[in-house]
Swiss-Prot record:
<protein>
    <recommendedName>
        <fullName>Non-structural protein 2a</fullName>
    </recommendedName>
</protein>
<comment type="similarity">
    <text>Belongs to the coronaviruses ns2a protein family.</text>
</comment>
<dbReference type="Pfam" id="PF05213">
    <property type="entry name" value="Corona_NS2A"/>
</dbReference>
<dbReference type="InterPro" id="IPR039573">
    <property type="entry name" value="NS2A-like"/>
</dbReference>
<dbReference type="InterPro" id="IPR007878">
    <property type="entry name" value="Coronavirus_NS2A"/>
</dbReference>
<dbReference type="GO" id="GO:0030430">
    <property type="term" value="C:host cell cytoplasm"/>
</dbReference>
<keyword id="KW-1035">Host cytoplasm</keyword>
Amino acid sequence: MAVAYADKPNHFINFPLTHFQGFVLNYKGLQFQILDEGVDCKIQTAPHISLTMLDIQPEDYKSVDVAIQEVIDDMHWGDGFQIKFENPHILGRCIVLDVKGVEELHDDLVNYIRDKGCVADQSRKWIGHCTIAQLTDAALSIKENVDFINSMQFNYKITINPSSPARLEIVKLGAEKKDGFYETIVSHWMGIRFEYTSPTDKLAMIMGYCCLDVVRKELEEGDLPENDDDAWFKLSYHYENNSWFFRHVYRKSFHFRKACQNLDCNCLGFYESPVEED
């Protein structure tokens, strides 16, 4: 089967860097050197790593959202991992840093998003980088500018672990920037949610087995969306944006708890259970 590529992208998966204060101080120091040298350029005000480009429509947001969270769910943290920034140089019209350490994360995001039927990654090889500034055509044509940029030094590492302020985001190309961040469609913390552990590694494993009609009988009217697809979406992951909803239904529905624990439907053994109060 031919692979579709996002060669005309309209969104990207963003890894924002503004939360990492030590990196930002050094990053801004590099920008100051460039401006102090008189290089005509537009400074990047939202430092980030573009992990993959996307060609998606608003109706795909839900699928990409879930794919991102499944990547987070499947991460094997160990002692965490390091991201290394080095080698300022010119890439196209931009001054960039090489970025090492996120290759596996890029591959996982592409694979999980494609598994949802959405278009990710480009036909050209992905190169991990962090943009510092964009050069004007005039600045790019000045040999002294090019020589200065190629002579610059930068070497910085950040460690990513479950307590780091690392996030994965869906961002539309051309999105507004404010206070060092892009306006996002979806933004998820990559760390482990210590406040709640799902009864299964993947709640999605029981989707299609647990019966919504039975679950609805144990809940208050309106607790679950009337549309079945919307209801499954609400229950299909336990991350930041609906952790309260998941815990609420898990507490209230005996059937849902048993289905989660057994990874199977237990309708034949269903009985009315008392509703637990918050």
